[in-house]
């Protein structure tokens, strides 16, 4: 009998915690990644995550938080992770609707739209996003609160 992994959407702020060691919630983000690698958790994201990942690495390079070699390694590592990327076309309309309704960026809303469409929780490492919308969206979760056994 095969075990079906639980599914969640992650945003780029969660994924970038796998690279940086100086951010809040890195232990839980690391556990989330371990659960994914070990097959207990299926990670989903809009394909936008790849661009935000690259932009986050670029910003870290400019701020001298990471070295060039670390950025290259991290850029390559993203494609090795078992993240189910969803194309823009799957969520474009719902993304615009959620951005308008919640007055959030189209980028942030893409992750929310995918989670709503899939009917799964969305984990974020962005405290401002979480604080602004967690009361309205009961499926939006702060990565620092991640525990596999708490997922529906």
Task: Describe every region a protein language model picked out.
Residues 1-7, 112-152:
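Acidic, PIN/NYN-like endoribonuclease modules and their adjacent C-terminal/linker elements
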Residues 1-48, 60-69, 73:
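Short, well-structured N-terminal submotif of metal-dependent ribonuclease cores
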Residues 3, 83-123:
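Active-site neighborhoods of divalent-metal-dependent phosphate/nucleic-acid chemistry enzymes
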Residues 14-15, 52-57, 74-77, 94, ...:
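A general alpha-helix detector
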Residues 14-15, 49, 91, 111, ...:
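Alpha-helix capping/helix-boundary segments
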Residues 38-40, 81, 118, 136:
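Structured helix-beta-strand junction loops
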Residues 45-46, 69, 78, 84-86, ...:
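Recognition helices and adjacent regulatory flanks at domain boundaries
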